[in-house]
């Protein structure tokens, strides 16, 4: 039996799939009503819509190569601060950052809307971008490495006397399952992408105001490390 059929096709085919769904239903096929047209908008460049007849179409392989090259140039100052990094490792970082920037910029937009893709904006380490989220993850991993073995967290049940920033971060983590359900119900990866950005913002705000590694109170230190590890896991 067919529970649901999802066709991922551009929004210019919307009428076709509406007619197809209605036709199947009237012909007695029970799955007619379960046909979903997951339409997506067109990708436009800063100087206008991509059109093959006008030669303004950008090849995906060329775009990815350019994003990786731009990422290598933009991130070189940060990469050069890493001790003993090899050229191969630097190239891998550029690949991950460049492709992450491209993927996130596309995913964060409601897929049913047209999107203006700006390569320079997508690769910025500040703002609603993939590199910003990746940098937040790298920051957390650095903290966890420096922390070493974390004490047992099974007794971290006392959530009294928490700051507003800590409570906000905890609430954001609690909201994760609901965000996943919403993304599934709406066929919208943008929900997850924008949740990840909001989570990164909340963590950075928390990290700015609260010491983790230098916290003298062992309970608070363990709790904050647990929060950091959970954010990274999500």
Model-derived features: positions:
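Non-catalytic interaction-recognition regions
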Residues: 1-234
């Amino acid at each position: 039996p067919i529970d649901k059929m999802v066709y991922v096709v551009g929004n210019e085919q919307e009428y076709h799939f509406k007619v197809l769904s209605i036709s199947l239903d009237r012909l007695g096929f029970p799955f007619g009503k379960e046909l979903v047209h997951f339409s997506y908008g067109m990708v436009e460049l800063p100087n206008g819509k991509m059109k093959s007849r006008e030669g303004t179409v950008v090849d995906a392989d060329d775009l990815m190569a350019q994003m990786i090259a731009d990422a290598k140039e933009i991130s070189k100052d940060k990469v050069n601060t890493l001790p003993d990094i090899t050229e191969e490792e630097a190239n891998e970082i550029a690949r991950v950052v460049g492709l992450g920037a491209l993927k996130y910029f596309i995913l964060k937009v409601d897929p049913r809307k047209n999107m203006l893709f700006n390569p320079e904006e997508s690769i910025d380490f500040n703002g609603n971008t993939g590199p910003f989220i990746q940098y937040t993850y790298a920051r957390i991993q650095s903290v966890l490495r420096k922390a070493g073995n974390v004490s047992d967290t099974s007794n971290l049940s006392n959530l009294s006397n928490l700051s507003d920033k800590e409570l906000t971060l905890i609430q954001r983590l609690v909201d994760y399952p609901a965000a996943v359900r919403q993304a599934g119900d709406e066929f919208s990866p943008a929900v997850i992408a924008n949740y990840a950005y909001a989570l990164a913002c909340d963590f950075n705000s928390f990290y700015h105001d609260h010491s983790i590694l230098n916290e003298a109170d062992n309970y608070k230190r363990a709790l904050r490390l647990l929060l950091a590890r959970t954010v990274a896991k999500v």
